[in-house]
Design a protein with these regions (language model features):
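C-terminal nucleotide
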Residues: 1-28, 53-89, 186-334, 349-388
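Gly/Ser-rich oxyanion-binding loop with an adjacent helix/lid
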Residues: 1-23, 29-33, 42, 79-81, ...
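N-terminal cofactor/phosphate-binding cores enriched in small/glycine residues
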Residues: 33-35, 47-48
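Glycine-rich phosphate-binding loop
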Residues: 342
Length: 388
Protein backbone atom coordinates (compact mmCIF):
# COMPACT_ATOMS: atom_id res chain seq x y z
CA UNK A 1 0.00 0.00 0.00
CA UNK A 2 1.66 3.20 -1.21
CA UNK A 3 0.20 5.27 1.65
CA UNK A 4 1.76 2.98 4.26
CA UNK A 5 5.15 2.94 2.48
CA UNK A 6 5.27 6.73 2.62
CA UNK A 7 4.12 6.69 6.26
CA UNK A 8 6.87 4.22 7.19
CA UNK A 9 9.45 6.58 5.72
CA UNK A 10 8.12 9.57 7.67
CA UNK A 11 7.81 7.47 10.85
CA UNK A 12 11.53 6.64 10.70
CA UNK A 13 12.38 10.32 10.14
CA UNK A 14 10.29 11.52 13.08
CA UNK A 15 10.61 8.71 15.60
CA UNK A 16 13.48 6.46 14.46
CA UNK A 17 13.34 2.82 13.38
CA UNK A 18 10.75 0.65 15.13
CA UNK A 19 8.39 -2.25 14.52
CA UNK A 20 5.03 -0.64 13.81
CA UNK A 21 1.42 -1.78 13.59
CA UNK A 22 -0.90 -0.14 11.04
CA UNK A 23 -4.49 0.92 11.72
CA UNK A 24 -7.27 2.56 9.70
CA UNK A 25 -10.42 4.42 10.69
CA UNK A 26 -12.96 5.61 8.10
CA UNK A 27 -14.82 8.86 7.69
CA UNK A 28 -18.59 8.76 7.42
CA UNK A 29 -21.40 10.17 5.35
CA UNK A 30 -24.93 10.39 6.72
CA UNK A 31 -27.54 9.56 4.09
CA UNK A 32 -30.52 10.94 6.04
CA UNK A 33 -31.35 11.86 9.65
CA UNK A 34 -29.48 15.11 10.29
CA UNK A 35 -29.33 16.87 13.66
CA UNK A 36 -31.51 14.07 15.02
CA UNK A 37 -28.82 12.17 16.94
CA UNK A 38 -28.69 14.47 19.99
CA UNK A 39 -32.49 14.86 19.77
CA UNK A 40 -33.00 11.15 20.45
CA UNK A 41 -33.94 10.27 16.88
CA UNK A 42 -32.72 7.92 14.16
CA UNK A 43 -29.81 8.38 11.77
CA UNK A 44 -28.72 6.44 8.68
CA UNK A 45 -24.97 6.84 8.17
CA UNK A 46 -22.33 4.68 6.53
CA UNK A 47 -18.55 4.52 6.79
CA UNK A 48 -16.57 5.46 3.67
CA UNK A 49 -13.22 4.30 2.32
CA UNK A 50 -11.56 7.68 2.91
CA UNK A 51 -10.30 8.09 6.46
CA UNK A 52 -7.34 8.18 8.81
CA UNK A 53 -4.33 5.85 8.89
CA UNK A 54 -1.95 5.39 11.81
CA UNK A 55 1.39 3.68 12.40
CA UNK A 56 2.01 2.81 16.04
CA UNK A 57 5.06 1.71 18.02
CA UNK A 58 5.11 1.22 21.81
CA UNK A 59 7.48 3.22 24.03
CA UNK A 60 8.94 2.21 27.37
CA UNK A 61 8.12 5.43 29.26
CA UNK A 62 4.84 7.17 30.15
CA UNK A 63 5.00 9.67 27.30
CA UNK A 64 3.38 9.54 23.87
CA UNK A 65 4.50 11.40 20.75
CA UNK A 66 2.07 12.14 17.92
CA UNK A 67 2.78 13.49 14.45
CA UNK A 68 0.32 14.31 11.65
CA UNK A 69 1.52 14.24 8.05
CA UNK A 70 -1.43 16.51 7.27
CA UNK A 71 -0.27 19.22 9.69
CA UNK A 72 3.54 19.08 9.55
CA UNK A 73 3.80 22.70 10.71
CA UNK A 74 2.68 21.58 14.17
CA UNK A 75 5.62 19.20 14.52
CA UNK A 76 5.70 16.32 17.01
CA UNK A 77 3.23 16.69 19.89
CA UNK A 78 4.39 15.15 23.15
CA UNK A 79 2.05 14.50 26.10
CA UNK A 80 1.89 12.44 29.32
CA UNK A 81 -0.26 9.27 29.27
CA UNK A 82 -1.56 10.13 32.75
CA UNK A 83 -3.62 13.18 33.65
CA UNK A 84 -3.44 14.88 30.23
CA UNK A 85 -5.41 18.14 30.00
CA UNK A 86 -6.59 20.05 26.95
CA UNK A 87 -4.33 22.85 25.77
CA UNK A 88 -4.33 24.98 22.62
CA UNK A 89 -0.69 24.01 22.06
CA UNK A 90 -1.83 20.45 21.26
CA UNK A 91 -4.09 21.70 18.44
CA UNK A 92 -5.45 18.75 16.40
CA UNK A 93 -3.87 16.32 18.88
CA UNK A 94 -6.49 17.23 21.52
CA UNK A 95 -8.77 14.70 19.78
CA UNK A 96 -6.59 11.60 20.31
CA UNK A 97 -5.28 12.93 23.64
CA UNK A 98 -8.89 13.32 24.81
CA UNK A 99 -9.46 9.63 24.11
CA UNK A 100 -6.40 8.68 26.19
CA UNK A 101 -7.76 10.78 29.06
CA UNK A 102 -11.32 9.38 28.82
CA UNK A 103 -9.97 5.82 28.79
CA UNK A 104 -7.82 6.58 31.82
CA UNK A 105 -10.83 8.08 33.63
CA UNK A 106 -12.80 4.92 32.79
CA UNK A 107 -10.14 2.80 34.52
CA UNK A 108 -8.07 1.85 31.46
CA UNK A 109 -4.82 3.67 32.22
CA UNK A 110 -1.93 2.80 29.91
CA UNK A 111 1.27 1.42 31.46
CA UNK A 112 3.38 3.07 28.74
CA UNK A 113 3.18 5.52 25.86
CA UNK A 114 3.37 5.22 22.07
CA UNK A 115 4.88 6.90 19.04
CA UNK A 116 2.03 7.39 16.56
CA UNK A 117 2.10 8.79 13.04
CA UNK A 118 -1.24 9.88 11.54
CA UNK A 119 -2.19 10.48 7.92
CA UNK A 120 -5.72 11.26 6.72
CA UNK A 121 -7.12 11.45 3.19
CA UNK A 122 -10.47 12.94 4.25
CA UNK A 123 -10.78 16.47 2.88
CA UNK A 124 -10.27 18.89 5.75
CA UNK A 125 -13.36 20.62 7.13
CA UNK A 126 -15.61 18.69 4.75
CA UNK A 127 -17.93 17.51 7.52
CA UNK A 128 -17.06 13.85 6.85
CA UNK A 129 -16.10 13.33 10.50
CA UNK A 130 -12.33 13.58 10.44
CA UNK A 131 -12.43 14.27 14.20
CA UNK A 132 -14.55 11.17 14.96
CA UNK A 133 -12.28 9.17 12.65
CA UNK A 134 -9.21 10.14 14.70
CA UNK A 135 -10.98 9.61 18.04
CA UNK A 136 -12.23 6.12 17.22
CA UNK A 137 -8.85 5.29 15.67
CA UNK A 138 -7.11 6.21 18.93
CA UNK A 139 -9.60 4.16 20.96
CA UNK A 140 -9.05 1.12 18.71
CA UNK A 141 -5.25 1.55 18.94
CA UNK A 142 -5.27 1.67 22.75
CA UNK A 143 -7.72 -1.22 23.00
CA UNK A 144 -5.64 -3.39 20.67
CA UNK A 145 -2.13 -2.45 21.81
CA UNK A 146 -2.97 -2.72 25.52
CA UNK A 147 -5.13 -5.85 25.10
CA UNK A 148 -8.07 -4.24 26.91
CA UNK A 149 -10.83 -6.30 25.26
CA UNK A 150 -13.37 -3.44 25.25
CA UNK A 151 -16.18 -3.93 22.73
CA UNK A 152 -16.61 -1.47 19.86
CA UNK A 153 -19.81 0.18 21.15
CA UNK A 154 -18.01 1.07 24.40
CA UNK A 155 -15.01 2.40 22.44
CA UNK A 156 -17.42 4.51 20.39
CA UNK A 157 -18.92 5.97 23.60
CA UNK A 158 -15.45 6.80 24.96
CA UNK A 159 -14.56 8.50 21.66
CA UNK A 160 -17.74 10.60 21.81
CA UNK A 161 -16.97 11.49 25.44
CA UNK A 162 -13.54 12.74 24.36
CA UNK A 163 -15.19 15.16 21.95
CA UNK A 164 -17.91 16.25 24.40
CA UNK A 165 -15.89 16.59 27.59
CA UNK A 166 -12.27 17.05 26.53
CA UNK A 167 -12.59 18.97 23.24
CA UNK A 168 -15.81 20.76 24.26
CA UNK A 169 -17.91 19.98 21.20
CA UNK A 170 -21.41 18.90 22.18
CA UNK A 171 -21.88 16.31 19.39
CA UNK A 172 -24.25 13.35 19.39
CA UNK A 173 -23.13 9.72 19.03
CA UNK A 174 -23.71 9.29 15.28
CA UNK A 175 -20.26 10.12 13.90
CA UNK A 176 -18.28 7.90 16.24
CA UNK A 177 -20.82 5.09 15.92
CA UNK A 178 -20.69 5.11 12.11
CA UNK A 179 -16.87 5.20 12.13
CA UNK A 180 -16.55 2.35 14.62
CA UNK A 181 -19.44 0.13 13.54
CA UNK A 182 -19.36 0.68 9.76
CA UNK A 183 -19.80 -2.33 7.49
CA UNK A 184 -18.91 -2.69 3.81
CA UNK A 185 -21.82 -1.95 1.43
CA UNK A 186 -24.19 -1.26 4.34
CA UNK A 187 -25.64 1.77 6.07
CA UNK A 188 -26.57 1.68 9.75
CA UNK A 189 -30.04 2.53 11.01
CA UNK A 190 -29.23 3.73 14.52
CA UNK A 191 -31.71 4.73 17.22
CA UNK A 192 -29.68 7.35 19.09
CA UNK A 193 -31.97 7.08 22.12
CA UNK A 194 -31.25 3.42 22.82
CA UNK A 195 -28.23 2.69 20.54
CA UNK A 196 -30.29 -0.14 19.03
CA UNK A 197 -29.05 -0.53 15.46
CA UNK A 198 -29.31 -2.68 12.39
CA UNK A 199 -27.42 -2.88 9.11
CA UNK A 200 -29.27 -2.19 5.88
CA UNK A 201 -27.72 -3.31 2.59
CA UNK A 202 -27.12 -0.38 0.24
CA UNK A 203 -28.28 -1.69 -3.11
CA UNK A 204 -28.87 1.48 -5.10
CA UNK A 205 -29.92 -0.16 -8.40
CA UNK A 206 -27.39 1.34 -10.82
CA UNK A 207 -26.88 4.50 -8.78
CA UNK A 208 -23.96 5.69 -6.66
CA UNK A 209 -23.52 7.99 -3.69
CA UNK A 210 -21.70 11.14 -4.80
CA UNK A 211 -20.27 13.42 -2.12
CA UNK A 212 -19.82 17.03 -3.23
CA UNK A 213 -17.61 19.30 -1.13
CA UNK A 214 -18.46 23.02 -1.00
CA UNK A 215 -14.74 23.62 -0.27
CA UNK A 216 -15.79 26.35 2.15
CA UNK A 217 -13.71 26.22 5.34
CA UNK A 218 -15.70 25.47 8.49
CA UNK A 219 -15.18 24.51 12.10
CA UNK A 220 -18.22 23.14 13.89
CA UNK A 221 -16.88 24.08 17.30
CA UNK A 222 -17.08 27.76 16.41
CA UNK A 223 -20.33 27.55 14.44
CA UNK A 224 -23.90 27.65 15.70
CA UNK A 225 -24.03 23.88 16.41
CA UNK A 226 -24.18 24.18 20.20
CA UNK A 227 -26.79 26.94 19.83
CA UNK A 228 -29.05 24.61 17.78
CA UNK A 229 -28.69 22.00 20.45
CA UNK A 230 -29.75 24.45 23.18
CA UNK A 231 -32.77 25.58 21.13
CA UNK A 232 -33.87 21.96 20.62
CA UNK A 233 -33.50 21.27 24.34
CA UNK A 234 -35.55 24.37 25.21
CA UNK A 235 -38.32 23.16 22.86
CA UNK A 236 -38.20 19.71 24.46
CA UNK A 237 -38.59 21.25 27.94
CA UNK A 238 -41.71 23.12 26.79
CA UNK A 239 -43.20 19.95 25.26
CA UNK A 240 -42.46 17.94 28.41
CA UNK A 241 -45.06 20.05 30.23
CA UNK A 242 -47.75 18.35 28.15
CA UNK A 243 -46.13 15.09 26.96
CA UNK A 244 -44.27 12.47 29.00
CA UNK A 245 -41.25 12.26 26.68
CA UNK A 246 -37.50 12.09 27.21
CA UNK A 247 -36.55 13.24 23.70
CA UNK A 248 -38.05 14.83 20.59
CA UNK A 249 -37.45 11.57 18.72
CA UNK A 250 -40.32 9.93 20.62
CA UNK A 251 -42.98 12.11 18.98
CA UNK A 252 -44.86 11.38 15.77
CA UNK A 253 -45.44 14.27 13.37
CA UNK A 254 -49.12 14.41 14.38
CA UNK A 255 -48.29 14.50 18.11
CA UNK A 256 -45.86 17.33 17.49
CA UNK A 257 -48.38 19.32 15.44
CA UNK A 258 -51.04 18.92 18.14
CA UNK A 259 -48.73 20.22 20.87
CA UNK A 260 -46.39 22.60 19.03
CA UNK A 261 -48.18 25.69 20.37
CA UNK A 262 -46.73 25.08 23.86
CA UNK A 263 -43.33 26.06 22.42
CA UNK A 264 -43.76 29.82 22.62
CA UNK A 265 -40.55 30.78 20.83
CA UNK A 266 -41.14 30.52 17.08
CA UNK A 267 -37.49 29.68 16.31
CA UNK A 268 -37.39 26.92 18.93
CA UNK A 269 -40.64 25.55 17.49
CA UNK A 270 -39.09 25.29 14.02
CA UNK A 271 -35.97 23.60 15.42
CA UNK A 272 -38.12 20.98 17.15
CA UNK A 273 -40.31 20.48 14.07
CA UNK A 274 -37.20 19.63 12.06
CA UNK A 275 -36.01 17.11 14.67
CA UNK A 276 -39.38 15.34 14.83
CA UNK A 277 -40.14 15.35 11.08
CA UNK A 278 -36.58 14.38 10.15
CA UNK A 279 -36.74 11.39 12.45
CA UNK A 280 -39.93 10.13 10.77
CA UNK A 281 -38.45 10.89 7.35
CA UNK A 282 -35.43 8.75 8.18
CA UNK A 283 -37.55 5.74 9.16
CA UNK A 284 -39.64 6.14 6.00
CA UNK A 285 -36.52 6.47 3.85
CA UNK A 286 -34.97 3.25 5.18
CA UNK A 287 -38.26 1.45 4.61
CA UNK A 288 -38.34 2.75 1.01
CA UNK A 289 -34.76 1.62 0.39
CA UNK A 290 -35.49 -1.85 1.74
CA UNK A 291 -38.43 -2.08 -0.69
CA UNK A 292 -36.02 -1.12 -3.52
CA UNK A 293 -37.78 2.24 -3.92
CA UNK A 294 -34.64 4.31 -4.47
CA UNK A 295 -36.74 7.07 -6.06
CA UNK A 296 -38.76 7.60 -2.85
CA UNK A 297 -35.55 7.51 -0.81
CA UNK A 298 -34.16 10.31 -2.98
CA UNK A 299 -37.32 12.43 -2.64
CA UNK A 300 -37.07 12.16 1.16
CA UNK A 301 -33.43 13.28 0.97
CA UNK A 302 -34.62 16.40 -0.86
CA UNK A 303 -37.27 17.03 1.83
CA UNK A 304 -34.57 16.65 4.47
CA UNK A 305 -32.49 19.40 2.88
CA UNK A 306 -35.46 21.77 2.71
CA UNK A 307 -36.17 21.19 6.41
CA UNK A 308 -32.50 21.77 7.31
CA UNK A 309 -32.60 24.96 5.26
CA UNK A 310 -35.90 26.42 6.46
CA UNK A 311 -36.58 25.00 9.94
CA UNK A 312 -33.11 24.22 11.28
CA UNK A 313 -31.26 26.89 9.30
CA UNK A 314 -27.90 25.12 9.07
CA UNK A 315 -27.30 25.14 5.31
CA UNK A 316 -26.04 28.46 3.94
CA UNK A 317 -25.58 29.64 0.33
CA UNK A 318 -22.89 27.12 -0.64
CA UNK A 319 -24.79 23.99 0.45
CA UNK A 320 -28.09 25.35 -0.89
CA UNK A 321 -26.48 26.08 -4.26
CA UNK A 322 -25.08 22.53 -4.50
CA UNK A 323 -28.39 20.91 -3.52
CA UNK A 324 -30.50 23.09 -5.82
CA UNK A 325 -28.13 22.50 -8.76
CA UNK A 326 -28.22 18.75 -8.12
CA UNK A 327 -32.03 18.74 -8.14
CA UNK A 328 -31.96 20.20 -11.67
CA UNK A 329 -29.63 17.51 -13.09
CA UNK A 330 -30.65 14.53 -15.17
CA UNK A 331 -30.25 11.21 -13.33
CA UNK A 332 -30.21 12.65 -9.79
CA UNK A 333 -32.69 10.91 -7.47
CA UNK A 334 -31.99 13.03 -4.41
CA UNK A 335 -29.50 15.43 -2.86
CA UNK A 336 -29.09 17.05 0.55
CA UNK A 337 -26.51 18.55 2.86
CA UNK A 338 -24.85 16.01 5.15
CA UNK A 339 -23.08 16.54 8.46
CA UNK A 340 -23.39 19.49 10.80
CA UNK A 341 -23.95 22.06 8.09
CA UNK A 342 -22.88 25.68 7.43
CA UNK A 343 -20.28 24.31 5.00
CA UNK A 344 -18.97 20.84 4.22
CA UNK A 345 -20.66 18.50 1.77
CA UNK A 346 -23.83 17.39 0.08
CA UNK A 347 -24.66 13.76 -0.57
CA UNK A 348 -26.47 12.84 -3.78
CA UNK A 349 -27.86 9.63 -5.27
CA UNK A 350 -26.92 9.74 -8.96
CA UNK A 351 -27.43 7.22 -11.76
CA UNK A 352 -24.00 5.84 -12.67
CA UNK A 353 -24.19 6.88 -16.32
CA UNK A 354 -25.16 10.45 -15.33
CA UNK A 355 -22.22 11.05 -12.94
CA UNK A 356 -19.78 12.68 -15.45
CA UNK A 357 -22.40 15.20 -16.65
CA UNK A 358 -23.58 15.78 -13.06
CA UNK A 359 -20.05 16.66 -11.94
CA UNK A 360 -19.38 18.89 -14.96
CA UNK A 361 -22.67 20.83 -14.79
CA UNK A 362 -22.70 21.30 -11.02
CA UNK A 363 -19.03 22.35 -10.96
CA UNK A 364 -19.52 24.97 -13.68
CA UNK A 365 -22.67 26.52 -12.22
CA UNK A 366 -21.40 26.43 -8.61
CA UNK A 367 -18.08 28.05 -9.55
CA UNK A 368 -19.88 30.76 -11.52
CA UNK A 369 -22.12 31.57 -8.55
CA UNK A 370 -19.85 31.02 -5.52
CA UNK A 371 -16.47 31.95 -7.01
CA UNK A 372 -14.52 28.73 -6.42
CA UNK A 373 -14.91 25.11 -7.48
CA UNK A 374 -16.46 22.20 -5.56
CA UNK A 375 -14.87 18.72 -5.35
CA UNK A 376 -16.55 15.37 -5.99
CA UNK A 377 -15.99 11.91 -4.48
CA UNK A 378 -17.91 8.78 -5.42
CA UNK A 379 -18.29 7.05 -2.06
CA UNK A 380 -17.16 3.50 -1.45
CA UNK A 381 -18.99 2.16 1.60
CA UNK A 382 -16.42 0.59 3.91
CA UNK A 383 -15.82 -1.34 7.14
CA UNK A 384 -15.30 0.45 10.45
CA UNK A 385 -12.08 1.22 12.35
CA UNK A 386 -9.63 -1.68 12.58
CA UNK A 387 -6.04 -2.90 12.65
CA UNK A 388 -4.76 -3.53 9.13
Amino acid sequence: MAILDEMNKVFREKFGAADTHAYFSPGRVNLIGEHTDYNGGHVFPCAISLGTYALVAPRTDGVSRLYSMNLPEQGVVEFPMHGAVKTDVYGWANYPIGVVRMMEDAGHAAAHGFDILFYGNLPNGAGLSSSASIEVLMAVILNDELGLGIDMVELVKLAQKAENIFVGMNCGIMDQFAVGMGKKDCAILLDCNTLAYRYSKLDLKGCSIVITNTNKAHSLVTSAYNERRMQSEAALKALQKVKAIKSLGELTNAEFDENAAVIEDEVERRRARHAVYENRRTLEAVEALEKNDVKRFGALMNDSHVSLRDDYEVTGPELDTLAELAWQQEGVLGSRMTGGGFAGCTVSIVRDEAIPAFEKNVAEAYTAKIGYAPSFYVANIADGARRL
